[in-house]
Swiss-Prot record:
Membrane topology: Peripheral membrane protein
NCBIfam families per UniProt: PS_decarb
Gene Ontology MF annotations: phosphatidylserine decarboxylase activity
Annotated source species: Acinetobacter baylyi (strain ATCC 33305 / BD413 / ADP1)
Top EC class for this record: lyase
Active-site residue list: D96 (charge relay system), H152 (charge relay system), S250 (charge relay system), S250 (schiff-base intermediate with substrate)
Protein name: Phosphatidylserine decarboxylase proenzyme
Gene name of the encoded protein: psd
Modification Pyruvic acid (Ser) occurs at: S250
Cofactor(s), names only, from the UniProt record: pyruvate
Length: 285
């Protein structure tokens, strides 16, 4: 890495610690929610151009018909654009994006990036709720700004708990993952816990810099309170059902218990995936 590249990287990391993360996200959130015709049209067009958004696969292909940038960003896709793998026991990608990492959780530590890991107990936010996953399996899917930003069920399960965990709002791209210790266990997140045929399953929606909100189909849009919020539920969702959505991008982490499933060998760090694509398989007979 050249001196200039290293300097840019170091400045990028340092800047994230210096900026008022939550205040910035609130300001961005206000703009994203605006239904002012001029504001939302300008923001949508600029975003669409910068990231090359393909609206031909969206349920609403006309950018001008979205009420706000948030509605545009969390747009639904046309029916049939994403096909959920229907094989018995298959585990599917919860979102469009890139696999940041996947594999085995060793002694309660989840691999984040070269030289970095984080505690599954800190990620989940509760020692008892984290216990089933300490030697289990994980996959981390990063949703870039250009991706479809709804998160779906990787496997059929009954939602038993949601735990909102306040935290920081670092960017979650590869540069940050390689340089911020315990990144995903430090950022604001919503932990969703399920009972499944494979035992316990977790889907963790991790917030990031300028993310204007996290929403689930059960809790609605999460309103940051600055404190842990544990809620109990009894809602069954099928594989491929929508679970939640991000307002301005981030990361979804899925966790399974030990010896309950295996990942398909074709997938590795930086593999591109789409929602519904098979990622792994149950080891249950």
């Amino acid at each position: 890495m050249s001196f200039t590249s290293r300097l840019k990287k170091d400045l990028f990391i340092k800047a994230q610690s210096l900026v008022p993360q939550h205040q910035l996200s609130r300001v961005v959130g206000k703009v994203a929610e605006s239904e002012n015709i001029l504001i939302k049209a300008a923001v949508i067009q600029a975003f669409k151009t910068k990231y090359g958004i393909d609206l031909s696969i969206a349920e609403q292909a006309d950018a001008l018909k979205y009420k706000s940038f948030n509605e545009f960003f969390t747009r639904a896709l046309k029916e049939g654009v994403r096909v959920v793998d229907s094989a018995t026991g298959s585990i599917v990608s919860p979102a469009d994006g890139a696999i940041s990492q996947l594999g085995t959780i060793h002694d309660g530590e989840v691999f984040q990036a070269k030289g970095q890991s984080f505690s599954v107990e800190k990620l989940i936010g509760d020692p008892q709720l984290a216990q089933p996953f300490k030697q289990g399996q994980f996959a981390t899917v990063y949703l870039s700004p250009r991706d479809y930003h709804r998160v779906h069920m990787p496997f059929t399960g009954t939602l038993t708990e949601t735990l909102y965990i306040p935290g920081e709002l670092f960017s979650v791209n590869q540069v940050t993952a390689e340089n911020i210790p315990g990144l995903f266990a430090r950022n604001e997140r919503m932990v969703c816990l399920f009972d499944t045929e494979l035992g316990r399953m977790a889907v963790v929606l991790v917030g990031a810099m300028i993310v204007a909100g996290i929403e689930t189909v059960v809790t609605g849009k999460v309103k940051p309170t600055g404190r842990l919020e544990l809620n109990h539920h009894d809602v069954t969702l099928q594989k491929g059902d929508e679970l939640g959505r991000f307002y301005l991008g981030s990361t979804a982490i899925i966790l399974f218990e030990k010896d309950k499933m295996v990942w398909d060998q074709q997938f590795k760090a930086n593999s591109i995936v789409v929602m519904g694509e098979k990622l792994g398989q149950s080891t249950n007979p």
